[in-house]
Amino acid sequence: MVRPNNNQLPENLPQLQNLIKRDPESYSDEFHIQYQHFLSLLEVFALNPSEENKSLDDIVMFVAQVAQCYPAVCEEFPKRLSDLLKNYATVLDPAMRNCFVKALILLRNKNLVPALDILELFFQLLRCPDKNLRTFLQTHIVTDIKNMNAKHKDMKLNSSLQAFMYSMLKDANPKAAKMSADIMIELYKKNIWNDSKTVNVIATVGCFSKVTKVLVTSLKFFLGHDEEDEEEDTDSENEVDLKGALMANRVNKKTKKRTKQLAQIKKQAVKAQKKKKNAPAFNFSGIHLVHNPQGMAEGLFKQLQATNERFEVKLMHLDVISRLIGIHDLFLFGFYPYITRFLQPHQRQVTRVLQFAAQASHELVPGDIIEPILKTIANNFITERNSSDVMAIGLNATREICMRCPLAMGEDLLQDLAMYKTYKEKSVMMAARSLITLYREQLPALLHKKDRGRQTEAQAERKVRAYGEREVHDTVLGAEALLKDSKTIDIESEDDTDSNDGEWVNVAHSDGEGGGADDDEEDEDEDEDDDDEDEDEENSNDEENEDEDNSDEGVESGEESAKAKKEKKDMRILNQKEAAQELALTRIFTDEDFKRINAANLKKTVTSARKRPLEQDRAEFVKLNSIEMIYKKRKHDKESRLETVQAGRQDRERFGWKDGRVNEHCSKTNREKRKTKNFGMLRHKARSKVKKSFKDKQQALRKHLLHQKKMK
């Protein structure tokens, strides 16, 4: 029997493909034959596109593989495939459709097809009822756009694609719209389309889509915290245990497989170490980039009131609206009465509803708007007919709301809630005390006098702000702590530098500095100096013949006093607050300076304030506060714990095996020596023990027992 020849080029396309890639010119005729064959098969296939054609499948992939060798001949090849997909996208056989898509991707990877044309076609193919194809296209679209923006962002292409995406989100096909939203969100998370245009397309179209899946996907994008938590969990689970792998490799038997596994674990450990050292890349939250947050919040609230979606979708609406209100300080007064309806202990997901109420609170919301929420929580949660957990949740929610809007709390309600500080259940008691602590810092006047506590310096410095008032700092808080070491600013009272009440410092200036008031004072000083000099001259003329030595000494002392007065004119007396402002303007703070500033600010929070202000001159007495300063006991860190452990080991015997010999320099027994011997020295004896017969073992045991008996 004659074997068939498998190397015939017209029928063996893989062999012809290999030869063409090596030498395109020599096999151009064969390629032309195959291309004409492709055109004829394509015309036949167009008559019945729903039928699979294996010959066309093979020849399409063949032409796509070698198209770069004959660009002039294959110029119309991508267009023919694109037209076929556009005209018969939903009718084509799934296998043939996948074949054409893969061929176009192959041509796109070789830069034989414009990116915009091919991506627009692929977005249209998302309407096809083929899940595998849609997933494949999504992966390719994201990868292709990522590669195009790898070196620098192609703004023109991105703008065109985003405009096309805008229309795709409005598509009537829910699957295409959902896939388009997924692609945009994935590109945003990969920092490719992380601009405001992408965010606002999702905000204006996705969040108001009639398709529930698109709506939920868009709302999750603006919430977007669960996925980050999941990534952190997976990272912690997949952490490489290099130390354990090294120990296992040392103990276990050495094999090639285990050696390869150890090398792979080492590579993973090095990679993880580099990843930890690299600066983390943060995704800027999309909710900050919304152009019209007020309009978006109002639209979502209107949609929420009219929707009949599941309760989970309503919770997403509430979450996004509350975040918009809290982040952008919006006014949406109808939101608060709406959310009050859900504030019942038996309400499903009531803790999340309380969270949304706190998120929607900010300082610019009038207290009269939020006060009904606090009263509802107090009436429904903070009552003794409920369990202690419900009461504690209500108090905690009240604290979170008041933390963002302190003026919403009334004096009577606050004092009633403060009475739970002595409640029998610890959870309720601690929650009430946390609320008291909050108002000790914010508005202590609302508390009962016995609940206000001893005022600290930080509380004394804090000004009670009215509605809508902003706290503006004109210097770095705590910069007074750096005045003592300042070279340009001289503190007159070096004995007491802990407080900023009435302390005065001298600030050195150059000759050209100073205001008009200082110039007037300098002029007056100069006039007085001139008068003094005239009087000195007259006196010196009268007494010139009497004592020449005294006149010389007077001239010298006059020169010294003039220098001292000139230096004094260059000094300007400031209080400590003004000196801190001067220091912030004339000095660049280092990390050590900021550490000292933070320590000084922390010190103010634990230092009791004075009942009356200190006097201006502070050199006459020592501050009582500097003696009675109380610091919180800090938790021991690892270094301090190790120091304590080492100190306890100094006068203690070491744990472990003890040498029972009276003289440590005398010889050891054979049994003790055997423990430290190399196994090679004991191998022969161990082998002889294994080979012993039962009778030999009996004799050896009898001999050993007799020897032990004699030793007694």
From Swiss-Prot:
Acidic residues bias locations: 491-501, 516-559
Q: Where are residues bearing Phosphoserine located in the sequence?
A: S236
Mind listing the GO biological process terms from this record?
protein transport; ribosomal large subunit biogenesis; ribosomal large subunit export from nucleus
KW Transcription (keyword) present: no
- Read off the InterPro entries from this record: ARM-type_fold, Sda1, SDA1_C, SDA1_MD, SDA1_N
Q: Which residues carry this modification: Phosphothreonine?
A: T234
Q: Where is the signal peptide?
A: none
Compositionally biased spans, kind Basic residues:
671-692, 700-712
Pfam families referenced in this protein's UniProt entry, alphabetically? SDA1_C (PF21638), SDA1_dom (PF05285), SDA1_HEAT (PF08158)
Q: What UniProt keywords apply to this chain's record, in alphabetical order?
A: Nucleus, Phosphoprotein, Protein transport, Ribosome biogenesis, Transport
Q: A single GO CC term, please?
A: nucleolus
Q: Where is the composition biased (Basic and acidic residues)?
A: 560-572
Instruction: Region Disordered: list its residue ranges.
Output: 488-573, 662-712
- Cellular localization per UniProt: Nucleus, Nucleolus
- The source's superkingdom equals Eukaryota
Write out the function statement from the record.
Required for 60S pre-ribosomal subunits export to the cytoplasm.
Into which family does the record put it? Belongs to the SDA1 family.
Q: PANTHER family, alphabetically?
A: HSDA/SDA1-RELATED (PTHR12730), PROTEIN SDA1 HOMOLOG (PTHR12730:SF0)
- Which protein are we looking at? Protein SDA1 homolog
